[in-house]
Amino acid sequence: MRYLILSLSFISIISFADDHAEETSFPGLVSTESFNLGNGMEMHVERRNSCNQDGTPKHFHPAAGTLVYVLDGTSQSKSSGDWKNYSKNEYWFERSDWVHGGEADTPSLPEGTCQQLLVIRVAEEGKDHTIFID
């Protein structure tokens, strides 16, 4: 009887966990850390590695701004108004609340293109620094 109860409990946990929609995130997210800056502000640092990635899901950042630094490879952004490729040791800035990602005009990068990115954002403590849009 004990094994039956344990088995049913395990199955119900698996069913419950499988019933939830997967949360949207950035492709290739390797790590994310937050640092308390004081005065109600936090710095969020993300590291991402991906290949053959021509875009991201539609989103915006209600942060003071976002700096994206290319550690290696090639990435692209439309933050300047036009699509631009960025390579190792280059970076771009994304203004607060700029809706981007999921654009129909996102250019395809050559097959096998990889990028390693370091993303830094400063946002109000306890608030979401990235909002994905359906």
Residues covered by each model-derived region:
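Glycine- and acidic-residue-biased ligand/ion/polar-headgroup-sensing regions
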Residues: A63-G81
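A short, N-terminal "cap"/entry segment at the start of jelly-roll beta-barrel domains
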Residues: L6, F16-H44, N85, W92-R95, ...
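Short acidic-glycine-tyrosine-enriched beta hairpin
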Residues: S50, S80-V99
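A short beta-loop-beta micro-motif enriched in histidine and acidic residues
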Residues: N52-T66
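Ligand-binding loop in jelly-roll beta-barrel domains
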Residues: D97-D128
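N-terminal post-signal-peptidase region of extra-cytosolic proteins
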Residues: C51-D54, L71-D72, S79, G101-A104
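Sec-dependent N-terminal signal peptides
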Residues: Y3-S12
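Extracellular/periplasmic catalytic domains that process cell-envelope and extracellular macromolecules
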Residues: G38-N39, H61-P62, Y69, K84-N85, ...
